[in-house]
């Protein structure tokens, strides 16, 4: 086994994480676009930014936001399925720590889990509200009033997305060294003709 080689498991984990990352980055950028360039209004109406084109037209931005969000959701589901045992173990450890039945986590551990929880909750709310808009429509379409009004769903989608982005940036910063270490090992294995080994599995810094 050559120095710096990685296992097939590590390579596959990295590819899934890369899909999550790419989907999240594009979804975040397009989401920020709509945060500052709201979609309501009409030509000559109350929205002075209506019809403004930045790189792409609004329809293209909307498609990018929708389908890269779908990519992120699918990749996250696969990610959680693969690391479900880790998630359950960490949840049990956290509960035992809070109830005093296990080893208390240090401040760094608690902060790390809190950030992970913020990412997960923000993602879940943004994903659910995003799926709502895929089927309920936007703009002048009739409001289906499913559980909440369209305005409430929009607020949930917007601010859960903001929370998710902030928490994800912090999460990424915390695990930056791990990310660069694994990426440096995985990228060479992606070259044509090179296959991952059955050996070294790089320990994850977290789910």
Describe each model-derived feature in a short phrase.
Residues 1-207:
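Membrane-embedded alpha-helical bundles that constitute the cytochrome b-like, heme-associated redox core
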